Structures are given as structure tokens and as C-alpha cells.
Amino acid sequence: MDTSNDRQRKPTLLNRRQMMLASGAAMAGTIPLLPITRATAASETGAAELRLTAGARTLTVNGKWARVFGLIGPNGKPGITLAPGERFHVGLVNRASTSTIIHWHGQLPPWTQDGFPWPQTPPLAAGDTRSYDYAPIAGTYWMHSHQGMQEQSLMAAPLIVHSAEDIRADRQEVVLMLQDFSFRAPEELLAGLTKSSGTQSAMPNTGMGNGMTTGSGSMAAMNMGSGMAMDLNDIDYDAFLANDRTLGDPEVIRTERGGRVRLRLVNGASATQFWVDLGALNGTLVAVDGHPVRPVRGSRFPLAMAQRLDVLIDLPPGNGAYPILAQVEGKRARTGIVLAAFGAAVSRPAAEADANAPPIDYSLERRLEAVTPLAPRAPDVKHRVNLAGAMAPYAWSLNGEYWPNISPLMVATGQRVAIEMLNHTMMPHPMHLHGHAFQVIAINAVPLAGAVRDTVLVAPMSSVTITFDADNPGRWAFHCHNLYHMMTGMMTEVRYTAMI
């Protein structure tokens, strides 16, 4: 699929630093440097305001046209990339025909700039502009709508914040964003799940509709033994996208022979988890959810919904082409891109693997160690959150409560907080806390000094414990990042006592 005329341009040979800077928030690779379009407003620091435009766009997916949303940055490409030390000073312009609100996933802004539709921070009306200005944290992040089901209609994009170390490393940067896609409207997909099971969405009717009309819902199951079945996929999607394209027309990213690449992987899918396979290559995982981890070597990595991975790859010196493939857990379907030396012939990878991918498990999570863990400290407050729900009736809850009728998890500024999440269901739940980076400290009650991150997968019939410092007062959403689970109730709030 082709969303621009970029593929008609002859590749421009740049050095690695130029390649990294040119990549911007583009979905990948070696694009020419483009003029930066900035709004006229300036922050208190004097920095010009970057413009981010939310609006509609057209894709071709498997030969068919589709009208979707997009978040287009100042270089005309999806998303935003910031230089080391640059503030997140952004003017969000809503050119869509409906209201929206954009969440800066994994970033730690003041709560009124987080991009969640609290009464105090309502969605941005069509035609309006809203400014954001805060000091970002470096790493691989992303942005997506928190308005209804707009995320499923591709209202999402990368958010990359470079560090000084990134610049010194002088690696070619490749951003790979994964998404799931259906020609049906998200509301139709949700209705297929809830109405067939006799339930209705728990989300209130507050004008938070998707505003975009573009499979029917079904469940894929895998036998776990002992008569139990793991539910992996709620939706039968029409396609899985890598940088807006399928393997019918994959993006080919040209690299230097023997080049050094930093692959930034973003799972922006609404209800799909992937196994990322580097094929003939080996890589070194150096960060998860934007936060550095001690190096983990490998060629195959799990990637839950909303999570990110940074993988360093040293390419062979020859004139080769190397597919980077993401296979859907529990399915043969896959998507991906191709890294290829300039002049190398490229073969189109098969859209299906030879066998179904296994479920995402804890094999990687147990190995992860934060480079900068939280300082040792006993928790001042502990919360237990029970994850419950079922496919029939289709409804998902936290502590037996369905959003918005919830009891907040209360914390106070300065506390060390621990949250134990117990998954009583046969589905995995990627749990995301807004406004904080937490550390994983136990899996199935077995202690570990795990990764610092913002989204952790809680596998079926298991538990995960996280801890964080309550250092960002406000109201913060805490939810499953499977959009269909969240829309049917699987969300609560972490609220500071100062907000009462």
C-alpha cells in the first residue's frame, strides 16, 4: 500500500547521522530531510511550537481504499521526533470532522496535559487548536487518541525523543509501527462482540464516538491443557499493518552495507500482540517502553499491545535484504518491513508463517533488568487489582467494577506504591498506567528486579506486581490496553489525595 509519492523518489544516500535525523517521526528509515513547519507561537523558553495535525487520510489496504485517521507532524510524516533536550512544545490542530483528544503514551507530563478526557480536560473540538508544553523523557513512545475508538481507525503515531547518547551512537534509526486494521467501523466490531453475547459497552454515552466509518468479531482459542482454553484474539482483522502497509507491498528501508541500525518497535495495535522475528539477524534489546534495560541478545521478541522495544542490529557487510517480521500471536498472519542494502534485490515475504505463533508469555519479561531501577524502598501503600471478565457475556472489569462506575486507587504524593494485578481470565491484559513509569517487581509472586516501563502484560491466570513513586499529582487512568476490553469497562483511576 502506498500513501505518498515517496516510493517514486530515488533513494538518497546519507550518512548514519543524517539518516537518523531525517527519519523524524516517519514510520521508518531513510527519507530526505524536509523543511520543518512550525506554528508561530513560542513557549516561555522561546522555542517555536511544533504543529501536529489530527485529521482524515486515505490508505490502500490489500488493493482497497480505506478512509482512516492520522496524526501528521511538522515534516508531513506521522508523529513527532524531538532532539535531545527539546521541549514537547506542540500545537495540536484538529482537522478531523469530530472531536478528539491525544494521549502521549508513556510520557510524564502534568496530568492536565496527559490527553485523557477528564471533565477538566475535555476533548478538542473539530477545528480547534490546543497547545502542550512540558519537558519530555527520552526514548521510544507513541501518541494515540483516547476518544472513543479512534485508535482503531489509526489515530496514532510514533513519538520519538532522542537522547544525547542516541546522537553519539550514530546509528541509522528505523521506526516500525504495528497496527491492526478492519474495513468495518470499530463500533461495528465492538457491537459484534457485545450484542452477540447479550451485553452492551460499559462506556457512557458522552459524545465520545469514533467519528470515522471505514470482519466480524470472533474469538481465536488455543488449548492450554486440562480442559482450559486461552483466548487470544477477539477480532478477525482484514489486515495487519507495518508503517501503514502489508506484506503485499512492504516498506523497503535502504541501509548501508554492514550498517548499524537502531530499530524502534511500537505496537500500536488495538487488540493484537505480536512476535517480532529478525530472521537471519541477531539483535540486542536495549530498552523497553523507552526505558533502558541491560542488554538481551536474540532474534525473536514478544511485543504486547502498547509496548515498545529498542533493538540494536549490526547488519552483515554483504549486499543483503533482511525481512523484519511481526507475527500475530495464535495465528499465521504476519506483517513487517525489509531492511536492504542499496542495490540489493528484495523478495516479497510471505504474508503467512508456516505455523501459528505461540501465546505471548513471560519468557522475556523475567529476563529484563532495568539499567536505572527504582531506589530500594518498602511500599507505603499496596493495592490489589483483580482482572476479570469473559467473552460471553463480553464484559471486562477491574475489582468487579466497570468504568466509569469505579472506586479510584488512592495514593498520596511521596508514597511508594505497589499494585498487584491478578488475572482471573483466559485472556492476556496489557495494563497501562498513565503519568508514571513503574518497575516490575514480581511475576506470580516470585520477586524480581525487573524492567522500568509503562505497560506490562498480565498473562492469563497469573499475576504481576509493579511499584512506582507517587511523584506526579493528578488523576491518572489505569487500564487494559486492549481497546475492546477498555471500552467494556476495564479501566480505573489512580487518584492523588490532593485531588479530592
Predicted regions and their residues:
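Short, hydrophobic/aromatic beta-strand segments
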Residues: 100-105, 272-278, 430-433
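Extracytoplasmic/lumenal soluble domains of exported proteins with redox or metal-associated functions
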Residues: 2, 38-154, 162, 206, ...
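A contiguous, surface-exposed recognition patch within enzymatic or periplasmic domains that forms
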Residues: 177-274, 377-380, 396
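Extracytoplasmic beta-sandwich strand-turn segments characteristic of Greek-key/jelly-roll folds
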Residues: 75, 79-82, 106-137, 168-170, ...
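Histidine- and aromatic-rich segments of cupredoxin/plastocyanin-like copper-binding domains
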Residues: 113-118, 122-124, 223-363, 443-451
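Extended terminal and domain-junction accessory segments
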Residues: 21-22, 29-51, 153-213, 291-428, ...
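N-terminal secretory signal peptides
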Residues: 1-14
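Asparagine-centered strand-capping/turn motif at beta-strand->loop junctions
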Residues: 92-96, 266-267, 421-425
